[in-house]
Amino acid sequence: MFGKILRSIFGSKNDRELKRMGKQVKLINELESTFVKLTDEELKAKTAEFKKRHQDGESLNALLPEAFAAAREASKRVMGMRHFDVQLIGGMTLHEGCIAEMRTGEGKTLMATLAAYLNAISGKGVHIVTVNDYLARRDANWMTPLYAALGLTTGSVYSMQPQQEKREAYAADITYGTNNEFGFDYLRDNMALRKEDRMQRPLNFAIVDEVDSILIDEARTPLIISGAAEDSSELYRAINKFIPSLKRQEIVEKGEEPSELGHYTLDEKTRQVELTEMGHEVIEDTLTKAGLLKEDDSLYAAGNLGLLHHVYAALKAHVLFHRNVEYIIQNDQVVLIDEHTGRTMAGRRLSEGLHQALEAKEGLQIQAESQTLASTTFQNYFRIYPKLSGMTGTADTEAFEFRHIYGLNVVVIPTNKPIQRTDLNDLVFLSVEEKYEAIVRDVNEYRAKGVPVLVGTASVETSEAMSERLKKADIPHEVLNAKQHEREAEIIANAGRPGNVTIATNMAGRGTDIVLGGNLEAELAKLENPTEEQIAKVKSEWQTRHDQVVAAGGLHIIGTERHESRRIDNQLRGRAGRQGDPGLSRFYLSLEDNLMRIFASDRMRSFMQSIGMEKGEAIEHRMVTNAIEKAQRKVEGRNFDYRKQILEYDDVANDQRRVIYSQRNELLDADEIHDAIDGIRQDVIADVIAGFIPPQSVEEQWDVAGLEQSLANEYGVQLPIQKWLDDDDKLNEESLRDKITQAMDDAYNVKREQLGNSVVMLEKQLMLHVLDQLWKEHLQNMDHLRQGIGLRAYAQKNPKQEYKRESFEMFQTLLESLKHDVIRLLFRVQPMTEEQMNEMEKRRQEEAERQRQRMQLRHAEAPSQLAAPATPATPEELSELKPERPYVRGGSKVGRNDPCPCGSGQKYKSCHGKLTG
């Protein structure tokens, strides 16, 4: 109550932000008359002037009014479009590192050019991130003339792009690309063996389009570059045969007895599958008969955990994954469907054997499992950018998460024209069939009035079921789903024509614009060498259709079910009512819908049945709407807990990733690492000596023979240590250490002379090779640790603390192994001629190219769903989160006197910084 009174007096935070930016808008508008008078060359020269002023110390904030005025003038001349005042506010929002929520059709793509141009003045590059390759290339091609008029270069990156072309795209002032491509290129750069092989410049500023999709919906899926691992396809086939015979046991209330015992339980809310006692017995018996498990052996014995992993993967494939819902079969391959966008995700594979289990289930060829070579998450990748911003039509419902995870505030940008769309209350039916009948009836009615209708569905399966019913009713329509995505542009272009009916999954929700009367630009583009008369005729026909649709009430949206997230529902609604057009939206639900069945309360179900509803009758009541929104909030809260938890675990790996990648880049950039190698060699030799001659020990405790053998076997250096002791009675522990160390230094210097000029390259290449190999093994070990860490809760231990402790110990082991392995290899390496070196480099490049083509770029199903679930965040843990300022990193490199990111508490130079000298 008190908050409402304060808001009525002072306005909301959003209102105050808009008011502040409004003053800048006034200033930009006043500059317009000055920039109109400039010639094209003078306008282009403004960019060089701005760059010079910025280099001389003038901030981008101070340049903003003039830069925005220049960008608007260039847009007017080149594109024929003048930025609205609200787009100027949106551009400022992006520049300040915030998220701009702007309604569909209000011009987000054009708005982004303002912030992109201003930040490109720094010369450090700007990345504009979109959700798919089509949008990235479309936006880049569309906006290139505008940037060129201002003297800036533009590039776009996409998968399987030639390396030189991609390097040029990253060198451009403004680079367009998908979140996947930017993320994978970052990982690939941190696998490069030469600095010339890296693509990206140091990251500077990113504008993320559809930011809620990328930073929230995609946040739970790690980016993984992987290589092939061992083949176990026969095991998948063998286990797949007996999974269908297993029965589900119903989950009952506490104290009740299940009507029938089953082999597994399924919790649809958390998508978790667990074997029951009876299930374990049946599976162990079946595996024993099949010769996969020894007699009297347990499935939970240490040596059989891999077998258990396969069983759970197969069980999940049959119980949690359904064809035409979570995946489709295309060209004899399992192709995943993005639940948020409805689009296929070609090339993306589930991790931990799930994809292989799906291939076995569908009787397809089983592709080999993979081993992680490099990984990160979008959450951690995008937090590397010193400045991050985003734009979307639906962000306000997730403002809390944006602020607490990414430090990004959401600013709701007002529409240029008032919204004319009518959002009707939901209609709720008892059964799915009754719901479908009502939809068919209303679609027919709207169509008869000349109203275009968009029927939104949540899955391919529902879209096909809806299509069958419209066919039976003889209603012509188009279907847009993951199977028909090739015709997407054509279907969307015609979706706004009078009486057209389009069924679409969520893929029609982003990056698409349904124009009332049809897409005029698409029609004109079809004409070959058109005359003025032909163009005028097409425009006249379009105007007639447009006016007809507007008079009929605009585009009507019918939602066939509510999505888990309110944002997805709002995106569907947002297809109607663009730029002040009329429109209407309504959702048709049933008690059999997944969201209602799983999350809605039993009280609502019993209420609807108790009021005696007739067949085909719908209820439209505020209590029902409230219950649905409550269910959605419940799901959104649960998903936020998952994402927060993943971030907490990945932050541990991310700290280690920062150390490794920082050292790797220092190695690549260094001309030579001789001093670092000398320091590492001193540490390694001291460790080896201490293993056989303990510090502050007496001679009787020394294992001199063991030390001689170790130095000979491991490092190829024969030292007569026992003879030294026999010949010199004065040799004590300290002087002996010095003598051994000096002898090893001399041996290495002889090796350096033998290697000649090649030693500089060899030291770097060996260090990189060993580092990459150990990091790859470390990632695999971290995966295994993460999968089982949830079980520590049963031992009254905090899984997160245990994960941090053990992963730190593993990381320490990695760094020690790195030192020892590098020095051992350098001592034993043989000299090569220049011809041999050139041949080795040629083979390395060929192998790198083969590996690049073999690499799988995939998104794991995160977190490990075969692992025991970790405890969700408690309300107390959530309350500890405090709003952060926009995320700004001090630089890409850890300072030598900064605390080491590994968490040891020591300075970086005294801890892991020692590795790079």
From Swiss-Prot:
Stretches of the chain forming a coiled coil according to its record: none
Cofactor: Zn(2+)
Membrane topology: Peripheral membrane protein
Gene Ontology CC: one annotated term: cell envelope Sec protein transport complex
GO biological process entries: intracellular protein transmembrane transport; protein import; protein targeting; protein transport by the Sec complex
SUPFAM superfamilies: Helical scaffold and wing domains of SecA, P-loop containing nucleoside triphosphate hydrolases, Pre-protein crosslinking domain of SecA
Binding site for ATP: Q87, G105, E106, G107, K108, T109, D513
Feature: compositional bias, Basic and acidic residues: 839-852
One Pfam family linked to the record: SecA_SW
EC annotation from Swiss-Prot or TrEMBL: 7.4.2.8
Alphabetized Gene3D superfamilies for the sequence: Helical scaffold and wing domains of SecA, P-loop containing nucleotide triphosphate hydrolases, SecA, preprotein cross-linking domain
InterPro entries assigned: Helicase_ATP-bd, Helicase_C-like, P-loop_NTPase, SEC_C_motif, SecA, SecA_CS, SecA_DEAD, SecA_motor_DEAD
Bias kind Low complexity: ranges: 862-876
Function comment: Part of the Sec protein translocase complex. Interacts with the SecYEG preprotein conducting channel. Has a central role in coupling the hydrolysis of ATP to the transfer of proteins into and across the cell membrane, serving both as a receptor for the preprotein-SecB complex and as an ATP-driven molecular motor driving the stepwise translocation of polypeptide chains across the membrane.
Protein's name according to its UniProt entry: Protein translocase subunit SecA
Gene: secA
